[in-house]
Amino acid sequence: MANVVVVGAQWGDEGKGKIVDWLSEQADVVVRFQGGHNAGHTLVVGEAVYKLSLLPSGVVRPNTLGVIGNGVVLDPYALASEIDRLAGQGVTVSRENLRVADNATLILSLHRELDALREDGAPGTKIGTTKRGIGPAYEDKVGRRAIRLMDLAEPETLPPKIERLLAHHNALRRGFGLEEISEQTILDELTGIAERVLPYQDTVWRLLDDARRGGKRILFEGAQGALLDVDHGTYPFVTSSNTVAGQAATGSGLGPRAIGYVLGIAKAYTTRVGEGPFPTELHDEIGQRIGERGHEFGTVTGRKRRCGWFDACLVRQTVKTSGIDGIALTKLDVLDGFDEIRVCTAYDIDGQRFDHLPASQAAQQRAVPVYETIPGWSGTTAGARSWADLPAQAIKYVRRIEELIGAPVALLSTSPERDDTILMHNPFED
């Protein structure tokens, strides 16, 4: 019996929510291990639709424990708001179904403000952040000046920690010509939310180790996608954390040998939100058609996603950098009815052929996709639940993707409904 890590194999928005929800039915514990409330996902459970940004998917499922690990940066007010929103939908979040790492870094209002100032004040060099303070909070974590969840339980220790934090942030604010923030303002912000979030704190690394030793099935839920990884993504147009599967260990406190099966999620085409290179992006009516059929708008921001053909080079890179054992291929039904479908198999950069996207930002901008054209299919894949339900050419398309990325398709999703899934291999039974 394996534990399972779910990671996005592209630039996020791959449909992880549905796959995690489908897998969480078999899991005892669901763990968030990186990111913050900057990436959302939609869960469809029966007739109910839940939109989560910070809470693990397990909290909406009975008898499943949701865990927010130390690798997550936590906005305590966003957490309280999301808990209240679920309560309005009839889902009670308590210590019985949610624990938060006591050493998780907190996102404060000054982080959100700094994030927005940088993004709005950088014409032509925007990264495409959600302005929710994720990056600045990670900066403070690495700079060893962050306020952590456990600090709220010891209010008498907060003043010197706030003083250290503001020594940095007020210097930045002076540079922006902004009024400095007082220590009392931050203290009030922290003490005002403490009683809402402290009941969930726990020593998560020990909790997860006990669960593992007790034979519990643990599902690690990644946010964003591996191509947004701060090291392995299209830097600097990336998120502020590691999003590859290895972060599941670091961001939860569980040893790397306990991670188990790595399931990568990839769309049957490619999308991206915000700025950054996108070799297969389509600016024509085909790209518009894919976006409209796939309802490609961000869960958190509502931003329109950029759309393009499937990029086998990028997913193949992700298979290697995340150690992916199998792929869940989503939104195959969006490609129904295309006469032909193109897949990027290599790049041409200044006359030289590359089988991967170089780390150089300049080279990425000059990368021209080399395509293989595959016949489309006239039948429908929407709602298919077995191979027998799929058009023959759709099966050929899936098999060709497997060959190009060097990993098998373990699950195939054919609609947003959780049961419209074709299972080839159950990751928990690896």
From Swiss-Prot:
Positions with a binding annotation for IMP: 13-16, 38-41, 130, 144, 224, 239, 303
Documented EC number(s): 6.3.4.4
Pfam family, one: Adenylsucc_synt
Chief place where the protein resides: cytoplasm
Alphabetically ordered keywords of this record: Cytoplasm, GTP-binding, Ligase, Magnesium, Metal-binding, Nucleotide-binding, Purine biosynthesis
GO molecular function: adenylosuccinate synthase activity; GTP binding; magnesium ion binding
Keyword Magnesium: yes
Cofactor note: Binds 1 Mg(2+) ion per subunit.
Enzyme class: ligase
Active site (record annotation): 13, 41
Pathway: Purine metabolism; AMP biosynthesis via de novo pathway; AMP from IMP: step 1/2
SUPFAM superfamilies, sorted: P-loop containing nucleoside triphosphate hydrolases
Function: Plays an important role in the de novo pathway of purine nucleotide biosynthesis. Catalyzes the first committed step in the biosynthesis of AMP from IMP.
Complexes and interactors: Homodimer.
Protein name: Adenylosuccinate synthetase
Lineage, top ranks: Bacteria, Pseudomonadati, Pseudomonadota, Alphaproteobacteria, Hyphomicrobiales
